[in-house]
C-alpha cells in the first residue's frame, strides 16, 4: 500500500513538472517582444543604474516613474542581448 501511494504521488509530481516545463517552453518560444521606447534620459539612467546594481530590475524601475521591472529588463536585453544583436544587425542591413 505504501509503495502505491508513493508511486501515485510521484506520478502527480511528474505530471505537474511536465505541465510547467511545457508552459514555460511555449511561453518563451511564442513571445515576440515589441521594442520598448525609452527617452534618452531613461536610457542613460538605466545604463548608470545597471553599472551600479547589475540586473536588479525592480530597483532600477523604482527610479524611473511609470516603468515596470519587466519593461526595463526587456529594454536591456533587446539592446544588449546577443540574440537581439543579430536581429539588429540584420535589420540595419536592409
Curated annotation (Swiss-Prot):
Domain Myb-like, residue spans: 30-80
Localization of this protein: Nucleus
Gene Ontology annotations of biological process type: epidermal cell differentiation; positive regulation of trichoblast fate specification; stomatal complex formation
Region of interest (S1, required for cell-to-cell movements), ranges: 1-10
Coiled coil: none
Keyword DNA repair part of the UniProt annotation: no
One GO cellular component, as annotated: nucleus
Domain of life: Eukaryota
SMART domains xref list: SANT
Covalent S-S links between cysteines: none
Function of the molecule: Transcription factor. Determines the fate of epidermal cell differentiation. Represses trichome development by lateral inhibition. Together with GL3 or BHLH2, promotes the formation of hair developing cells (H position) in root epidermis, probably by inhibiting non-hair cell formation. Represses the expression of GL2 and WER in H cells. Positively regulates stomatal formation in the hypocotyl.
Protein name per the record: Transcription factor CPC
Organism expressing this protein natively: Arabidopsis thaliana (Mouse-ear cress)
Gene from which this protein is expressed: CPC
Amino acid at each position: 500500500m505504501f509503495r502505491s501511494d508513493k508511486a501515485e504521488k510521484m506520478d502527480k509530481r511528474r505530471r505537474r513538472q511536465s505541465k510547467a516545463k511545457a508552459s514555460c517552453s511555449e511561453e518563451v518560444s511564442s513571445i515576440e517582444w515589441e521594442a520598448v521606447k525609452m527617452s534618452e534620459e531613461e536610457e542613460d539612467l538605466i545604463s548608470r543604474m545597471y553599472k551600479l546594481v547589475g540586473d536588479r530590475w525592480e530597483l532600477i524601475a523604482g527610479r524611473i516613474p511609470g516603468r515596470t521591472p519587466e519593461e526595463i529588463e526587456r529594454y536591456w536585453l533587446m539592446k544588449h542581448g546577443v540574440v537581439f544583436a543579430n536581429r539588429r544587425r540584420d535589420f540595419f542591413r536592409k
